[in-house]
Amino acid sequence: MNLIQLPVEELRCFFINIFNVLVLHSKVTSKAPVDDDHVVPRCSFFRNTSYQVGKYFYSLDDICRGVLRAKKCLFLDCDPRIHFALSYGTRHTPQARVFGAHSLDSELDSATRNFCTDRVRVDVEGGVVTLPLLCEWYSKDFEASGKTVIEWVSAFVPPNVAAGIAAASARKDLRVVYE
């Protein structure tokens, strides 16, 4: 398989699916669970867990940071919606699912909307917007669009939540909480 010859959306879809399968495969076969609260084992897990694709080995870290986040890859732009498609097998990330190359755009929209609808909360009176931890971890990816994280997320929540975010954001004492 020559990955360079794949259209960009097929390539993105391929690596999202490989990432999710690799996480699931590794968690099932690993003796030591990797959870949200243990940073060192998690970092090691992402650097050392890999699949061979053709002649090359791709670790979870290579796939997420290098290919999908476009840090080492010249043929893909970073699409922040990938963060709502990648499952790390933790409570702070979405559940693993398989994506289709020909419907990837709409599936990424749907995954993003579903995750944000479940996780984004707003307290207008208190001036607090609660966002998923993913938004803090990858804030630079969201902000690369020219929007703040809050503005970016507002496009993927129900209208009443987006209106609440806008009202809370107008306050001088706005607080953003990540959980």
Predicted regions and their residues:
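Interaction/scaffold regions that mediate signaling and macromolecular assembly across diverse proteins
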Residues: 1-179
